[in-house]
């Protein structure tokens, strides 16, 4: 039995999809455990680029079982469209399994996301407007509709009817916008359910059976630790738990069955949307990193905010997620920058702070403490081992590992999976 969790150590977009794809070669089962289609990941497979939002990265390997776990919220329309996108490119999806306990995103969740963000105005949190938060709210309020409900038209109609009474009152009385008729949703979404019915099962059984049989299971996190609803920069976070602990809740696998946690970081830091970002760059270097690294959101297309590597953030991620292995991505993007900086701590009112603050007010007053390192000009995109790297690039990677306290397992020097290099294995 061997299981590995892949988590983002920053604010998402660290390249988890590529690392999951890379590790999928050794895995036999690949599972997602939280989030929804608010998370995009780009994978290059056989020279072709694919953008996925819901389906696990392992889908390109027909011999791997791919699981959408119970902790996810699923937009059935988006899922059907993503399946069609893969089928058009001759990707076999018969290896997909969808949890019957996962919750469903419906049109009123999407509309609620939009009107609530508009209502907040300057206080908006930068949601992707995919209905994720409202769907998780319904789940917590125990009025959510699950995949199992969607497949039973009588149950679906009953729950939909009940929910629309409340949602329409909210739309009309509070937001002063129009609501929905049952007919707007029922038949269309029931049909989506029928299109995915062949994939639906109890995925907790699938995963636990696989582990008990000694198969290698890879859990793929979405977003990143700093977007975790409990451990992230609240309230500028997602509505679920991307940390490794979220695996047990979102997949139905007990904590004793988790063996390795790979933390994925960029060699710098990025963020989409609003919220604190201590090492953010507003200069030509930031623009250079954004353009060279193509730092635009997979889901939204929004330019990502860019900053120096922040070891305070990644140390926090290591602690709350139990990270055992570091995957450092996009090192090549830093090529040509004369002097590089790594944030080693913060300074708050004259005091050095080494742990990430919970208070956004405190964080807003924190100034990064930087360590400067010399850069490199050599092209490193063809490098296949640490020994082939320029001395300064190797020193930069070593310093990141030292400051975060996480041993290096993987490093990446470009977007293609062939530019991903293994330093040590994670699967038994």
Swiss-Prot record:
Binding locations of substrate: 298-304
Catalytic activity of the protein: IMP + L-aspartate + GTP = N(6)-(1,2-dicarboxyethyl)-AMP + GDP + phosphate + 2 H(+)
Keywords: Cytoplasm, GTP-binding, Ligase, Magnesium, Metal-binding, Nucleotide-binding, Purine biosynthesis
Pathways involved: Purine metabolism; AMP biosynthesis via de novo pathway; AMP from IMP: step 1/2
Keyword set includes Iron: no
Pfam families in alphabetical order: Adenylsucc_synt
Cellular component terms per the entry's GO annotation: cytoplasm
Binding site for Mg(2+): 13, 40
Gene3D superfamilies reported in the protein's UniProt record: Adenylosuccinate Synthetase, subunit A, domain 1 (3.40.440.10), Adenylosuccinate Synthetase, subunit A, domain 2 (1.10.300.10), Adenylosuccinate Synthetase, subunit A, domain 3 (3.90.170.10)
SUPFAM superfamilies reported in the protein's UniProt record: P-loop containing nucleoside triphosphate hydrolases
Enzyme class label: ligase
Annotated active site: 13, 41
Residues noted as binding IMP in the record, renumbered to the chain: 13-16, 38-41, 128, 142, 223, 238, 302
A GO term, aspect molecular function: GTP binding
Entries under InterPro entries matching the protein: Adenylosuccin_syn_GTP-bd (IPR018220), Adenylosuccin_syn_Lys_AS (IPR033128), Adenylosuccinate_synth_dom1 (IPR042109), Adenylosuccinate_synth_dom2 (IPR042110), Adenylosuccinate_synth_dom3 (IPR042111), Adenylosuccinate_synthetase (IPR001114), P-loop_NTPase (IPR027417)
Assigned protein family: Belongs to the adenylosuccinate synthetase family.
Summary of the function given for this chain in its UniProt record: Plays an important role in the de novo pathway of purine nucleotide biosynthesis. Catalyzes the first committed step in the biosynthesis of AMP from IMP.
Name assigned to this protein: Adenylosuccinate synthetase
């Amino acid at each position: 039995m061997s299981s590995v969790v892949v988590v983002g150590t920053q604010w998402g977009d660290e390249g988890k999809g590529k690392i999951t794809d890379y590790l999928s070669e050794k895995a036999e089962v690949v599972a997602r455990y939280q989030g929804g289609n608010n998370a995009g990941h780009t994978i290059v497979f056989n020279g072709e680029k694919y953008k996925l939002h819901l389906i696990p990265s392992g889908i390109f390997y027909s011999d791997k079982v791919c699981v959408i776990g119970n902790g996810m919220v699923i937009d059935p329309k988006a899922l059907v469209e993503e399946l069609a996108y893969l089928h058009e490119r001759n990707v076999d999806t018969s290896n997909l399994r969808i949890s019957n306990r996962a919750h469903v995103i419906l049109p009123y969740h999407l509309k609620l996301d939009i009107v609530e963000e508009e209502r907040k105005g300057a206080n908006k949190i930068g949601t992707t407007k995919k209905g994720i938060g409202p769907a998780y709210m319904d789940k917590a309020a125990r009025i959510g509709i699950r995949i199992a409900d969607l497949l039973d038209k009588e149950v679906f109609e009953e729950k939909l009817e009940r929910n629309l009474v409340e949602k329409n009152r909210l739309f009309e009385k509070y937001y002063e916008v129009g609501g929905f008729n049952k007919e707007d949703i029922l038949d269309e979404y029931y049909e989506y359910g029928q299109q995915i019915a062949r994939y639906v099962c109890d995925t907790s059984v699938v995963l636990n059976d696989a582990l008990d049989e000694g198969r290698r299971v890879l859990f793929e996190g979405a977003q990143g630790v700093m977007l975790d609803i409990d451990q992230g920069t609240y309230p500028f976070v997602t509505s679920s738990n991307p940390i490794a602990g979220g695996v047990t809740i979102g997949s139905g696998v007990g904590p004793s069955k988790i063996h390795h946690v790979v933390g994925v970081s960029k060699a710098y830091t990025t963020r989409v949307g609003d919220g604190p970002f201590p090492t953010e760059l507003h200069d030509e270097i930031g623009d250079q990193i954004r353009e060279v690294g193509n730092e635009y959101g997979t889901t939204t297309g929004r330019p990502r905010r860019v900053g120096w590597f922040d070891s305070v953030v990644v140390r926090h991620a290591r602690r709350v997620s139990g990270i055992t292995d570091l995957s450092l991505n996009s090192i090549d993007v830093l090529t040509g920058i004369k002097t590089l900086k790594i944030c080693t701590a913060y300074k708050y009112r004259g005091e050095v702070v080494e742990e990430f603050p919970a208070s956004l007010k405190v964080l807003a007053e924190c100034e990064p403490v930087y360590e400067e390192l010399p850069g490199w000009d050599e092209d490193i995109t063809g490098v296949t081992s640490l020994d082939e790297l320029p001395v300064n690039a190797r020193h930069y990677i070593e310093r990141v590992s030292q400051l975060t306290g996480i041993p290096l397992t993987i490093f990446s020097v470009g977007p293609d999976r062939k530019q991903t290099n293994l330093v040590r294995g994670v699967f038994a």
